[in-house]
Amino acid sequence: MASEEASRNSRSRWEPEGRFPRQDKYSVLLPTYNERENLPLIVWLLVKSFSESGINYEIIIIDDGSPDGTRDIAEQLVKIYGSDKILLRPREKKLGLGTAYIHGMKHATGNYIIIMDADLSHHPKFIPEFIRKQKEGNFDIVSGTRYKGNGGVYGWDLKRKIISRGANFITQILLRPGASDLTGSFRLYRKEVLQKLIEKCVSKGYVFQMEMIVRARQLNYTIGEVPISFVDRVYGESKLGGNEIVSFLKGLLTLFATT
C-alpha cells in the first residue's frame, strides 16, 4: 500500500488520470472568417476536451468582419459558455492571420497559446497530446504534423495532396526548418515565445506559419511534434486560392534569400 502511494506521488501532476496542472492556462486563438456553421461545433469540442482533461483554458475568437453572421454566433457562444471561457474580440475587416494572433494575444491571460483552424480541420482531441509532449520535453513549441508517424490528411483529392507534399518537400530542401510540417497551423507555444516570433515575422497569410518555424530555428527555440489527422473542412469554402499559392511561392523565395 505504501509503495503504491509513493508511486502515485512520484508521478508528475499532469500524468495521472489525464489531469493537467491547474497553474498552467491555455489560451486558444481562433481567427474566423465566414465560419458560422463550423464555430459552434469546434467550440463545443474544445470545451469538451478541456473539461474532460481538467485543463484550465480560455477560447478567444477573433472574427474579421464575417458577412455570414459568424460574430452573432460567437456572441451566443459567449452567453452559453460564459465570458470567462469564451472571449469575443472582433475586428472590423479581414486584416491577416498574423495580426489576428497579435490582436488575440493582447487579450490572452494564459501562459500557453494554442493556435488552430476554426473550420474543424484540426480536432481538439489532439490538444492533451500537445500538452503532454510539451511537458515531457519542456519544448518551447509543439507543432502538429501531417507528415510524421501516423499523421495524415483526409478529404483532399490526389491533386491537392501532391501539391501539399510537393510544397512541404521544397520548403524542407530550401529552408531546413527542423520540423516535418512547415505549413501546418495547429500549434502550441509558450506565450512569450509566440510574442517574440511574431515580432520577428514579416510575412502575411499562409506564409506566416512557415516563417514562424524558420524564425524559431534561428532563435534556437525547441520544437516538439505530435502526429495529427488533418481533415478537410466540412462546411464552407476553402480560402486557399490562386493568389494564396502565388503568395506562398514568393514568401518561400523571400525566406530562402533572407534566412
Swiss-Prot record:
Record keywords: Acetylation, Endoplasmic reticulum, Glycosyltransferase, Magnesium, Manganese, Metal-binding, Phosphoprotein, Transferase
Cofactors, names only: Mg(2+); Mn(2+); Ca(2+)
Q: Which InterPro entries match?
A: DPM1-like, Glyco_trans_2-like, Nucleotide-diphossugar_trans
Q: In which pathway does it act?
A: Protein modification; protein glycosylation
* Positions of Mg(2+) binding: 119
Q: Which reaction does it catalyse?
A: a di-trans,poly-cis-dolichyl phosphate + GDP-alpha-D-mannose = a di-trans,poly-cis-dolichyl beta-D-mannosyl phosphate + GDP
Task: Cite a single GO MF annotation.
Answer: metal ion binding
Which Pfam families does this chain map to?
Answer: Glycos_transf_2
Q: Which GO terms describe its biological process?
A: dolichol metabolic process; dolichol phosphate mannose biosynthetic process; dolichol-linked oligosaccharide biosynthetic process; GPI anchor biosynthetic process; protein mannosylation; protein O-linked mannosylation; response to oxygen levels
Designated name of the protein: Dolichol-phosphate mannosyltransferase subunit 1
This chain's source organism reads Sus scrofa
